[in-house]
């Protein structure tokens, strides 16, 4: 910025000085007594006296301030400066402001304000990352689908340009979704987040295709090498070429990386299969243990076109999604498993995240549970959305600079977070003239107290309540009469949604289940997801 006024002389600066400010993304949430790290690069050939402050959105209220001073030669070269600011009050719509009363030219670059209490100390908002962690995710697919490919290859995610010091990353235009990213959330940060969550990273790599372009198989070699280099960055020793870059970023031990997905929905494109085989052969030659995911369906996979997993994306109306509970029932039981890496209810009744959409997705997941011998894993898409910049609906978690809430489908996922590693049990449902219900049963162990539960989930997608008689065989006296509970996700209307004004309008409600036993009558509300968690004696199994 060029400052033409001064503290004295004929052109005196106004009270408080002149300068620039940045509100961040729709305002910064500054909390009382919390410490915020400010990082910036500065250059100037003039003497500098620069006030850096956190202020209210109108600039009238000062929350915290720090002054950068230096002689005429101190900042001739780019200089990195870091300091902390601590506010004495709360303000959910703040801005970062730079002001001075000294004439001269000041260059600023790579300016950042970050709270000191991020999730695991790695930069993610603690409240949002904790919501994700509460789901006990088993894998994290990144950096995305269309985001990884781009509308044009020049705007695709290039992992090598997203590692190293943040200020040295060039950033890129995410033309798939229409915004610029500085790539502060890069390859390293995704791997770190997966590690912090205890989840397996699933890296989606560009296969030489974008929405409008495609690299021929004869010219794919450099992109193949780039992916192999990326795996070395994640898994290589600290003295390898790319492993040393990771080590310099503070993670000398290799990351876990067991899954690589080749492309995103490009099976139909001219060169996909030829390019895929080049990626497959090169990755397996160096890392034979990595599971490679194909964008083609199971029918295309053969010894000459191998894959460890195949990717499935499901977007449908709520009624259609409910019917897909049986989607994998007739899938051949041999060969590679599916990874349903994207699924969501879309359309009019999806809204911004309705109850009925969540119930349809629950029914779909019940079907995946029943077919877990042919389905490896599944994830909803998208996961997060900033309410100020919605590009897609619905999403599981909505946030702004200071608030967040889970949509009904987020709370629905809590009913399935104990399914990984659980034992599945067959179920049979007999209801006359009513086809709007599906159910599943698993046994799972609470890791905190090692108690074992039989979890029976029932999805009622219809508009009438149902009384059920549950009969459990093969347990004997294994169900304890106390310690069981019933949890219900429902609301007064199927199109109900959560919001910042009513963040818990559609959330699970739990109650003790009195006198749980092998045979019991239960009531299931219309438009509901109900879970019966029955506390068991150790080492018992069942047929339901």
Task: Give the residues covered by each predicted segment.
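Active-site neighborhood of glycoside hydrolase catalytic domains
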Residues: 226-229, 233-371
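Short, well-ordered beta-strand segments enriched in hydrophobic/aromatic residues
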Residues: 452-461
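Extracellular and organelle-lumenal recognition/adhesion modules and their flexible linkers in secreted
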Residues: 1-183, 200, 214-222, 285-287, ...
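Conserved, mostly hydrophobic/aromatic
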Residues: 40, 136, 194, 230, ...
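Active-site mouth of glycoside hydrolases
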Residues: 73-76, 91, 152, 157, ...
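C-terminal beta-sandwich/jelly-roll accessory domains of carbohydrate-active enzymes
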Residues: 461-544
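The substrate-binding groove and active-site-proximal loops of carbohydrate-active enzymes
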Residues: 112-122, 167-184, 206-221, 258-273, ...
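Aromatic/acidic polysaccharide-binding cleft in carbohydrate-active enzymes
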Residues: 148, 208-212, 335-442, 449-452
């Amino acid at each position: 910025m060029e400052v033409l006024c001064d503290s004295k002389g004929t052109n005196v600066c106004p009270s408080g000085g002149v300068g620039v400010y940045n509100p961040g993304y729709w305002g910064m949430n500054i909390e009382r007594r919390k410490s915020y790290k400010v990082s910036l690069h500065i250059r100037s050939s003039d003497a500098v006296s620069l006030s850096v402050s956190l202020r209210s959105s109108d600039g009238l209220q000062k929350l915290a301030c720090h002054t950068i001073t230096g002689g005429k030669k101190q900042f001739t070269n780019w200089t990195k400066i870091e300091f902390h600011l601590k506010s004495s009050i709360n303000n959910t719509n703040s801005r970062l402001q730079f002001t001075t009363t000294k004439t001269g030219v000041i260059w600023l670059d790579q300016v950042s304000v970050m709270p000191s209490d991020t999730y695991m100390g790695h930069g993610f908002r603690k409240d949002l990352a904790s919501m994700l962690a509460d789901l006990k995710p088993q894998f994290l697919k990144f950096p995305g689908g269309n985001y990884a490919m781009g509308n044009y290859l020049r705007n695709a995610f290039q992992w090598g340009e997203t590692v190293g010091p943040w200020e040295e990353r060039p950033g890129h235009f995410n033309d798939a979704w229409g915004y610029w990213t500085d790539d502060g959330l890069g390859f390293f940060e995704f791997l770190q987040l997966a590690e912090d969550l205890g989840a397996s990273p699933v890296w989606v790599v560009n296969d030489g295709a974008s929405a409008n372009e495609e690299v021929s198989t004869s010219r794919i070699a450099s992109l193949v090498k780039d992916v192999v280099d990326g795996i070395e960055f994640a898994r290589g020793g600290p003295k390898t070429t790319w492993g040393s870059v990771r080590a310099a970023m503070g993670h000398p031990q290799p990351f876990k990386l067991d899954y690589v997905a080749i492309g995103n929905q490009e099976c139909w494109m001219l060169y996909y299969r030829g390019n895929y085989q080049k990626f497959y052969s090169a990755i397996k030659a160096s890392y034979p243990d990595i599971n490679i995911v194909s964008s083609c369906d199971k029918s295309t996979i053969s010894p000459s076109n191998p894959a460890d997993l195949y990717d499935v994306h499901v977007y449908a109306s709520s009624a259609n999604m409910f019917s897909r509970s049986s989607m994998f029932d007739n899938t051949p039981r041999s060969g590679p498993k599916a990874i349903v890496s994207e699924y969501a209810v879309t359309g009019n009744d999806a809204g911004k995240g309705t109850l009925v959409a969540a119930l349809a997705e629950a029914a779909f997941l019940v079907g995946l549970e029943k077919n877990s011998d042919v389905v490896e894993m599944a994830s909803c898409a998208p996961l997060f959305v900033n309410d100020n910049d919605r590009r897609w609906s619905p999403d599981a978690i909505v946030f702004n600079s200071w608030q967040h809430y889970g949509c009904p489908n987020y709370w629905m996922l809590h009913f399935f977070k104990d399914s990984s590693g659980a034992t599945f049990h067959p179920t049979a449902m007999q209801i006359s003239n009513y086809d709007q219900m599906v159910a599943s049963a698993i046994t799972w162990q609470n890791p905190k107290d090692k108690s074992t539960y039989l979890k029976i989930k029932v999805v009622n997608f219809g508009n009438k309540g149902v009384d059920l008689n549950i009969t459990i065989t093969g347990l004997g006296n294994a169900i304890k009469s106390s310690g069981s509970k019933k949890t219900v996700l429902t609301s007064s209307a199927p199109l109900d949604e959560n919001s910042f004004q009513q963040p818990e309008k559609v959330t699970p409600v739990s109650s003790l289940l009195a006198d749980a036993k092998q045979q019991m009558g239960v009531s299931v509300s219309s438009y509901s997801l109900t879970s019966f968690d029955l506390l068991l004696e150790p080492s018992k199994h069942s047929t339901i």
